Amino acid sequence: MALVFSGCNMNNTTKGGLIGGAGGGALGAGIGAAIGALINGSSGAKLGAAIGAGVGVAGGTTAGVLIGRKMDKAKKEAEAIANAQVSDAVDQNGYQAVKVTFESGILFQSGKSVLSAAAQSSLNKFATDVLAANPDMNVGIVGYTDNDPWKGKTAEQSVAANQKLSEQRAQAVSNFLQKHGAAANQIQEVVGLGESNPVADNATAAGKQQNRRVEVYLYASDAMIEAAKQGTLQ
């Protein structure tokens, strides 16, 4: 799964047409390495190049528009979920996707991977109202932590512990979503990236809270892409 953030202020339907059409090559060249680096750390340049190439060859204007329309619908559905922060993304094929971020402070107690009651309520609604309603969308789940050290552990051990915690939290979210509406084959990838890719300054408590998060990506499955190319995607 290769996903990048999009900074455009147009809806996914419009962006889908631009990305799927002839303009994709230029857009891909502009966003690939720079944004990919934010996602994948030191290997972001390679990831970004792949993303950039994908944006340039996405399956045509019509397919991009149809997929963008589906993503707009899913985005609105996700925006109705409590504690969910929703934004746009672009998948490895250059099609529009949706990124949903849940702060781990809402999902979990500090240092734990057991979902809180409030988290279960939000994720249950997300599973039933968004994932189950869009079975032709693939899902990728990525867990992160802040860089707080663990008591009694060395710096290296703390990094490893945070990595493991991020994996456990991502898996906890995946397991819950599958039990409450998401199909098992809908969730394509579940990974933890530990302390990497902070979105805020770890020097402040507020920044640490933002960095403790689980991101859920919704992106077009092969079946959705094929239907879009055939013009039959509803």
What residue spans do the PLM features occupy?
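C-terminal motif of bacterial Sec signal peptides marking the signal peptidase cleavage site
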Residues: 3-7
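Short, low-complexity, glycine-enriched hydrophobic/amphipathic alpha-helices that associate
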Residues: 9-79
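Soluble non-cytosolic domains of exported or imported proteins
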Residues: 21, 25, 69, 109, ...
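Extracytoplasmic/secreted envelope proteins and their assembly/folding machinery
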Residues: 32-35, 75, 79, 112, ...
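Periplasmic peptidoglycan-binding/tethering modules of Gram-negative envelope proteins
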Residues: 50, 54, 62-138, 219-234
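A short, charged
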Residues: 125-157
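Periplasmic OmpA-like peptidoglycan-binding domain that tethers envelope proteins to the cell wall
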Residues: 145-227, 232-234
